[in-house]
């Protein structure tokens, strides 16, 4: 097959700038082949190289006594004691999910699960953070239904419980949804598998499903803005098979137990190219591949297609040579392909052979370690103008506006499509704050949450970045867990625009300050840029996934109050309405500054709640919608009415940070008040749970009517 001529148009179609192509010519001293151009394009795009973000990601705190492995591997590894580790990561599948919602979301789940089990962990929990356009937008319902069905279809069939996440709607996502997938697994701390190749002449082995043409160019597509050619990009979306992935998991874990593996890497973005280059680069070795040996499910595939295919359920391994027969037998037992496709070499070369031809011969380090790195121009986001006055609103009408919005409505429509109980270790299912999963065979449990408030980040990237971490800290604390570590999924627009790059820089600085203050180091993550359509960017959305630990289920704080429990707020309420959910949902406004986060107060109040958990019947953090929404959700979830004695729009709906709502048995109220006074922590009694009415200040509504609205609004909006 004749390869196409390398033209400026072909170079641009590969996402390479003219100066980047000149850099390639300088590195290799000649014009690249078509396959080589594809390899450079895949390895130098944002999705694989982090060329616009690397400078700032390096500033994040990533270490601590609990951290076994931080960023740079497939996922982060954190010590949970007793010789065990939790391995976790969050990453995006935004562009594919907009183009082909079901498969885009499904393969996002599959990819993050492989990131976890390629390190030797059995997945125990999944979450997803989803951002969609306005419910009445022509594409939104189709995308929501496809994404949720895809997540459920893959996760349920694979057999991992989905235990949490978030769903939001905003016009900024009309042309670019966000699908951020999280997975966590358990492994023995001394049996972690890494991706760095070692040893010369070691066999490089292809494992799993066969290679097809699906996903060719997917990584490059994920590093570009959308325009009116979006439908043409549908072939770049991968197709997943969760049953094959389940077999791949079992085969990999069995293989790892046989002492056969030198290094292992899943094939994700840029497929065979990225996995081989990363293994060689980390091990300071070259890689030679013979593509004739690659298992193919389609005829006449070219070297270009095989190197850039993003077919799912595939791994690449450097194998101990003497273990070939053992390893082959394991994969044949699981009805999966096992093929030796290359070897490690001492030279700094990435050598690709197909037929009797050399299709690529490149310096391997140039593809990864010396890829372009940019210090993009950025401008600081201007300080938000003061919030315009807010007239007092009927609190019941304010509450109805929130619970009738699909962003804050009950999400049973979503959760019920996910299996949250598979593996039989789920303690708290979706919809009750952080998810909690037992560490099988031990008294311990792990808690999981994902959080961000994009309105805050747009108004004030630094405070919004801090708040995403602080809310994750509170959500873990509210179930009784001690926060351990975090993963970040940075979703932003075009970094070549200084104002967008300024949002990114501000958010990174805020996240860094918060994870340092709250001892929640970033151990893994993902950056998704160019989330724009026709020049319109998404809201800056730096999603934080966080993990906490309970040493036993005795430390668990329940999520439901009991009849007659007293409602109290831990933390100070000043009544901050800027960028609040009430402004957005009731008044259609997004003005004012984001609430500022006092990290000292966050830590102090969180430690206070964990120290006094035995006095508390139930707890939740206060965030979107303030006291009114949190109290209603807590009461309604228990089938109880509610009376809040505080009055005033700002007091009921303000979104001041570092606050928790707790339900306390009347007999324990004085003890908690005494503990708060001794600790110097603000504690305000705000009402009581019980009855069949919801009373906010001086106005009331029947619980049954509000519950009907809350539980029906999501399905009504999506249709």
From Swiss-Prot:
Keyword Ribonucleoprotein on entry: no
Keywords from the UniProt entry: ATP-binding, Cytoplasm, Ligase, Magnesium, Metal-binding, Nucleotide-binding, Purine biosynthesis
Catalytic activity: N(2)-formyl-N(1)-(5-phospho-beta-D-ribosyl)glycinamide + L-glutamine + ATP + H2O = 2-formamido-N(1)-(5-O-phospho-beta-D-ribosyl)acetamidine + L-glutamate + ADP + phosphate + H(+)
Entry EC no(s): 6.3.5.3
Keyword Nucleotidyltransferase attributed: no
Pathway it works in: Purine metabolism; IMP biosynthesis via de novo pathway; 5-amino-1-(5-phospho-D-ribosyl)imidazole from N(2)-formyl-N(1)-(5-phospho-D-ribosyl)glycinamide: step 1/2
GO BP terms, alphabetized: 'de novo' IMP biosynthetic process
Binding site residues for Mg(2+) 2: 115, 266
Residues at the catalytic site: 47, 93 (proton acceptor)
One Pfam family per UniProt: FGAR-AT_linker
Gene3D superfamilies: PurM-like C-terminal domain (3.90.650.10), PurM-like, N-terminal domain (3.30.1330.10)
Family annotation (SUPFAM superfamilies): PurM C-terminal domain-like, PurM N-terminal domain-like
Positions with a binding annotation for ATP: 50, 89, 488, 525
Ligand binding (Mg(2+) 1): 91, 526
Record InterPro entries: PRibForGlyAmidine_synth_PurL (IPR010074), PurL_linker (IPR041609), PurM-like_C_dom (IPR010918), PurM-like_C_sf (IPR036676), PurM-like_N (IPR016188), PurM-like_N_sf (IPR036921)
Record's subcellular location: Cytoplasm
Source taxon at top rank: Bacteria
A GO molecular-function annotation: magnesium ion binding
Chain positions recorded as substrate binding sites: 92-95, 114, 238, 310-312, 528
A GO CC annotation given for this chain: cytoplasm
Family matches, as NCBIfam families: FGAM_synth_II, PRK01213.1
Subunit and interaction comment: Monomer. Part of the FGAM synthase complex composed of 1 PurL, 1 PurQ and 2 PurS subunits.
Assigned protein family: Belongs to the FGAMS family.
HAMAP family: PurL_2 (MF_00420)
Record's function text: Part of the phosphoribosylformylglycinamidine synthase complex involved in the purines biosynthetic pathway. Catalyzes the ATP-dependent conversion of formylglycinamide ribonucleotide (FGAR) and glutamine to yield formylglycinamidine ribonucleotide (FGAM) and glutamate. The FGAM synthase complex is composed of three subunits. PurQ produces an ammonia molecule by converting glutamine to glutamate. PurL transfers the ammonia molecule to FGAR to form FGAM in an ATP-dependent manner.
Identification of the protein by name: Phosphoribosylformylglycinamidine synthase subunit PurL
Species of provenance: Cereibacter sphaeroides (strain ATCC 17025 / ATH 2.4.3) (Rhodobacter sphaeroides)
């Amino acid at each position: 097959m004749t390869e196409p001529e390398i033209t400026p148009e072909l170079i641009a179609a590969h996402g390479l700038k003219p100066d980047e192509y000149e850099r390639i010519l300088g590195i290799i001293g000649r014009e690249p082949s078509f396959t080589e151009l594809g390899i450079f394009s895949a390895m130098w795009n944002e999705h694989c190289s982090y060329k616009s973000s690397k400078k700032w990601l390096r500033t994040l705190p990533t270490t601590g006594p609990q951290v076994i492995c931080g960023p740079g591997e497939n996922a982060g590894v954190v010590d949970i004691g007793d010789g065990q580790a939790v391995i976790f990561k969050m990453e995006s599948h935004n562009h594919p999910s907009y183009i082909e919602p079901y498969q885009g979301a499904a393969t996002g789940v599959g990819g993050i699960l492989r990131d976890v089990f390629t390190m030797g962990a059995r997945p125990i929990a999944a979450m997803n953070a989803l951002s969609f356009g306005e419910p009445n937008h022509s594409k939104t319902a189709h995308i929501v239904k496809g994404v949720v069905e895809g997540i459920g279809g893959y996760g349920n069939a694979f057999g991992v419980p989905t235990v949490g996440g978030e769903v939001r709607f905003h016009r900024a996502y009309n042309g670019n949804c966000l699908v951020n997938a999280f997975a966590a697994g358990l492994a023995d701390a001394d049996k972690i598998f890494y991706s760095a190749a070692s040893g010369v002449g070691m066999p490089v082995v292809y494992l799993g499903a066969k290679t097809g043409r699906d996903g060719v160019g997917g990584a490059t597509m994920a590093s570009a803005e959308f325009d009116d050619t979006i439908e043409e990009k549908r072939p770049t979306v991968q197709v997943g098979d969760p049953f094959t992935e389940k077999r791949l998991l079992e085969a990999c874990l069995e293989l790892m137990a046989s002492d056969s593996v030198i290094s292992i890497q899943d094939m994700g973005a840029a497929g065979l190219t990225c996995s081989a280059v990363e293994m060689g680069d980390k091990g300071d070795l070259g890689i030679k591949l013979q593509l004739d040996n690659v298992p193919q499910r389609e005829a006449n595939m070219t070297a270009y297609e095989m190197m850039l295919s993003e077919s799912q359920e595939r791994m690449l391994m450097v194998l101990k040579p003497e273990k070939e027969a053992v390893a082959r037998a394991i994969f044949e037992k699981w009805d999966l392909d096992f093929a030796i496709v290359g070897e490690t070499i001492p030279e700094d070369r990435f050598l690709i052979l197909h037929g009797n031809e050399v299709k690529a011969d490149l310096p391997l380090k140039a593809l990864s370690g010396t890829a372009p790195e940019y210090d993009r121009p950025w401008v600081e986001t201007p300080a938000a103008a003061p919030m315009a006055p807010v007239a007092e609103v009927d609190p019941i009408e304010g509450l109805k506006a929130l619970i009738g919005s699909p962003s804050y409505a009950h999400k049973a429509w979503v959760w019920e499509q996910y299996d949250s109980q598979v593996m039989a270790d789920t303690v708290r299912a979706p919809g009750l704050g952080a998810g909690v999963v037992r560490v099988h065979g031990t008294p311990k449990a792990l808690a999981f949450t994902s959080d961000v408030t994009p309105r805050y980040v747009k108004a004030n990237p630094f405070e919004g970045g801090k708040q995403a971490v602080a809310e994750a800290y509170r959500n873990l604390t509210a179930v009784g867990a001690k926060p351990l570590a975090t993963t970040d999924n940075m979703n932003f627009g075009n970094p070549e625009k200084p104002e967008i790059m300024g949002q990114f820089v501000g958010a990174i600085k805020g996240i860094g300050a918060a994870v340092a203050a709250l001892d929640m180091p970033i151990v893994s993550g993902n950056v998704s840029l160019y989330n724009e359509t026709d020049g319109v960017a998404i809201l800056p959305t730096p999603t934080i996934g966080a993990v906490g630990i309970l040493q036993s289920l005795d430390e668990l704080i329940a999520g439901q109050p009991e009849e007659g429990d007293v409602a109290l707020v831990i933390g100070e309420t000043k009544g901050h309405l800027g960028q609040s959910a009430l402004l957005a949902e009731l008044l259609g406004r997004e003005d004012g500054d984001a609430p500022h986060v006092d990290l000292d107060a966050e830590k102090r109040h969180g430690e206070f709640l964990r120290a006094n958990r035995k006095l508390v019947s139930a707890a939740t953090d206060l965030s979107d919608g303030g006291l009114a929404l949190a109290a209603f959700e807590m009461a309604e979830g228990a089938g109880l009415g509610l009376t809040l004695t505080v009055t005033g729009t700002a007091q009921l709906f303000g979104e001041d940070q570092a606050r928790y709502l707790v339900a306390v048995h009347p007999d324990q109220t004085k003890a908690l008040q005494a503990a708060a006074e001794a600790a110097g922590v603000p504690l305000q009694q705000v009402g009581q749970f019980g009855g069949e009415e919801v009373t906010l200040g001086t106005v009331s509504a029947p619980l049954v009517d509000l519950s009907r609205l809350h539980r029906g609004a999501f399905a009504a909006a999506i249709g």
